[in-house]
């Protein structure tokens, strides 16, 4: 909205307004807008969630120290998503289909998370939405992304560009790819996209178990993916760094900026001791958006490196459940991984800050793959 206002109308009367067409400037403006939106509306959102008694249901089989969190409002992810949506609509070029795909992903996965949170609150049951229904709708969202992105890729006039938008890029090697485009009807790409998005969504959700633990790594990874989207959306940088040039990705940078500002604004209230939790409505949507951006930029492997904390949390649950079913023994004292360290005697703040340090180091490592080709 504001992008169109400044670039297409006001610039006719005052030429400096045309600077808003710069992705770099709009990225900065988006961070500022989303950060201010989250911080300003945070107290009102928390007060409303308290008034309607949207309190967190704490599992009785988790760490005993978490029982003190009973009564803390949840579903704060609504604030994050609203901030992302508002700032994106303000500063992104809304003619770009990638922007709208990300907004639809945010709505679908956010709606599933909202339903899950609401059922937990209504029935005072931390299990929430029935797994079958939950994964059906998450699958719908992931398949929508895969199908939409493949359709856009298939409409490119240059077959080489279609392949660049579909094949899996292998970091560190300039010409190594996995030819997902080899399967007919985009099946390879769509199936792979399905697993990336659903895996990312659930991994972030599993990480969201301590005050501030998930949101700052989400910000770090969004920043890393923002660099990839900026580079791949600029033909000069893409050619120099040997990454696929995908023009649509320049506007994806704006969505990454919205996630950064909104996440930092939410952390203001989610830092220990948390005044509000994001809930599944935030975690599922943010994870799905990160996965979608990774697919859009063709940086799924770099994303797995940058989001290594999320991967470790998800794997810890898989290993714990698998080991218990097969051997009747636990691998960890408690899963997900952050609870294991709590059981070892680490304080919550120690776990969170140390995991943050690991997260930022992994993002730096992932960004290094840009140059090491």
Curated annotation (Swiss-Prot):
<keyword id="KW-0131">Cell cycle</keyword>
<feature type="transmembrane region" description="Helical">
    <location>
        <begin position="28"/>
        <end position="48"/>
    </location>
</feature>
<dbReference type="GO" id="GO:0051992">
    <property type="term" value="F:UDP-N-acetylmuramoyl-L-alanyl-D-glutamyl-meso-2,6-diaminopimelyl-D-alanyl-D-alanine:undecaprenyl-phosphate transferase activity"/>
</dbReference>
<feature type="transmembrane region" description="Helical">
    <location>
        <begin position="212"/>
        <end position="232"/>
    </location>
</feature>
<feature type="transmembrane region" description="Helical">
    <location>
        <begin position="276"/>
        <end position="296"/>
    </location>
</feature>
<dbReference type="GO" id="GO:0008360">
    <property type="term" value="P:regulation of cell shape"/>
</dbReference>
<feature type="transmembrane region" description="Helical">
    <location>
        <begin position="94"/>
        <end position="114"/>
    </location>
</feature>
<dbReference type="Pfam" id="PF00953">
    <property type="entry name" value="Glycos_transf_4"/>
</dbReference>
<keyword id="KW-0961">Cell wall biogenesis/degradation</keyword>
<keyword id="KW-0132">Cell division</keyword>
<keyword id="KW-1133">Transmembrane helix</keyword>
<dbReference type="GO" id="GO:0009252">
    <property type="term" value="P:peptidoglycan biosynthetic process"/>
</dbReference>
<keyword id="KW-0479">Metal-binding</keyword>
<protein>
    <recommendedName>
        <fullName>Phospho-N-acetylmuramoyl-pentapeptide-transferase</fullName>
        <ecNumber>2.7.8.13</ecNumber>
    </recommendedName>
</protein>
<dbReference type="GO" id="GO:0046872">
    <property type="term" value="F:metal ion binding"/>
</dbReference>
<dbReference type="GO" id="GO:0051301">
    <property type="term" value="P:cell division"/>
</dbReference>
<comment type="similarity">
    <text>Belongs to the glycosyltransferase 4 family. MraY subfamily.</text>
</comment>
<keyword id="KW-0472">Membrane</keyword>
<dbReference type="GO" id="GO:0005886">
    <property type="term" value="C:plasma membrane"/>
</dbReference>
<feature type="transmembrane region" description="Helical">
    <location>
        <begin position="72"/>
        <end position="92"/>
    </location>
</feature>
<dbReference type="InterPro" id="IPR000715">
    <property type="entry name" value="Glycosyl_transferase_4"/>
</dbReference>
<feature type="transmembrane region" description="Helical">
    <location>
        <begin position="301"/>
        <end position="321"/>
    </location>
</feature>
<dbReference type="InterPro" id="IPR003524">
    <property type="entry name" value="PNAcMuramoyl-5peptid_Trfase"/>
</dbReference>
<keyword id="KW-0133">Cell shape</keyword>
<keyword id="KW-0808">Transferase</keyword>
<dbReference type="Pfam" id="PF10555">
    <property type="entry name" value="MraY_sig1"/>
</dbReference>
<keyword id="KW-0997">Cell inner membrane</keyword>
<keyword id="KW-0573">Peptidoglycan synthesis</keyword>
<keyword id="KW-1003">Cell membrane</keyword>
<comment type="pathway">
    <text>Cell wall biogenesis; peptidoglycan biosynthesis.</text>
</comment>
<dbReference type="InterPro" id="IPR018480">
    <property type="entry name" value="PNAcMuramoyl-5peptid_Trfase_CS"/>
</dbReference>
<dbReference type="GO" id="GO:0071555">
    <property type="term" value="P:cell wall organization"/>
</dbReference>
<feature type="transmembrane region" description="Helical">
    <location>
        <begin position="252"/>
        <end position="272"/>
    </location>
</feature>
<feature type="transmembrane region" description="Helical">
    <location>
        <begin position="350"/>
        <end position="370"/>
    </location>
</feature>
<dbReference type="GO" id="GO:0008963">
    <property type="term" value="F:phospho-N-acetylmuramoyl-pentapeptide-transferase activity"/>
</dbReference>
<feature type="transmembrane region" description="Helical">
    <location>
        <begin position="135"/>
        <end position="155"/>
    </location>
</feature>
<keyword id="KW-0812">Transmembrane</keyword>
<keyword id="KW-0460">Magnesium</keyword>
<feature type="transmembrane region" description="Helical">
    <location>
        <begin position="177"/>
        <end position="197"/>
    </location>
</feature>
<comment type="function">
    <text>Catalyzes the initial step of the lipid cycle reactions in the biosynthesis of the cell wall peptidoglycan: transfers peptidoglycan precursor phospho-MurNAc-pentapeptide from UDP-MurNAc-pentapeptide onto the lipid carrier undecaprenyl phosphate, yielding undecaprenyl-pyrophosphoryl-MurNAc-pentapeptide, known as lipid I.</text>
</comment>
């Amino acid at each position: 909205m504001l992008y169109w206002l400044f670039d297409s109308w006001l610039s006719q009367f005052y030429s400096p307004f045309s600077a808003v067409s710069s992705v770099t400037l709009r990225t900065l403006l988006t961070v500022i807008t989303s950060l201010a939106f989250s911080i300003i509306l945070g107290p009102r959102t928390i007060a409303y969630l308290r008034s309607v008694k949207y309190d967190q249901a704490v599992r009785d089989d988790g760490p005993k120290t978490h029982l003190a969190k009973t009564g803390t409002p949840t579903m704060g992810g609504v604030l994050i998503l609203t901030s992302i949506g508002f700032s994106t609509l303000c500063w992104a070029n809304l003619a770009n289909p990638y922007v709208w795909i990300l907004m639809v992903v945010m709505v679908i996965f956010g709606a599933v998370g909202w339903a899950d949170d609401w059922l937990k609150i209504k029935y005072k049951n931390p299990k929430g939405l029935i797994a079958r229904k939950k994964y059906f709708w998450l699958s719908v969202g992931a398949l929508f992304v895969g199908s939409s992105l493949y359709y856009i890729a298939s409409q490119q006039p240059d077959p080489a560009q279609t392949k660049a938008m579909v094949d899996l890029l292998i970091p560190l090697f300039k010409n190594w790819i996995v030819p997902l485009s080899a399967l007919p009807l985009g099946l390879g790409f769509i199936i792979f996209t399905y697993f990336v998005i659903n895996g990312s969504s659930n991994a972030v959700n599993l990480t969201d178990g301590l005050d501030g633990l998930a949101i700052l790594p989400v910000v770090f990874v969004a920043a890393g993916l923002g660099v990839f989207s900026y580079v791949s959306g600029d033909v000069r940088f893409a050619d120099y760094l040997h990454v696929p040039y995908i023009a649509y990705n320049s506007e994806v940078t704006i969505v990454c900026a919205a996630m950064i500002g909104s996440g930092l604004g939410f952390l203001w209230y989610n830092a220990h001791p948390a005044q509000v939790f994001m809930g599944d409505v935030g975690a599922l949507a943010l994870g799905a958006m990160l996965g979608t951006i990774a697919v859009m930029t063709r940086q799924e492997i770099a994303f797995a490196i940058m989001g290594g904390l999320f991967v470790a949390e998800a794997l810890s649950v898989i290993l714990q459940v698998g080991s218990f079913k097969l051997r009747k023994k636990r691998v960890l004292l408690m899963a997900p991984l952050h609870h294991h360290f709590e059981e070892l005697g680490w304080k919550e703040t120690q776990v969170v800050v140390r995991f943050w340090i690991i997260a930022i180091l992994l993002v730096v490592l992932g960004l290094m793959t840009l140059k090491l080709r």
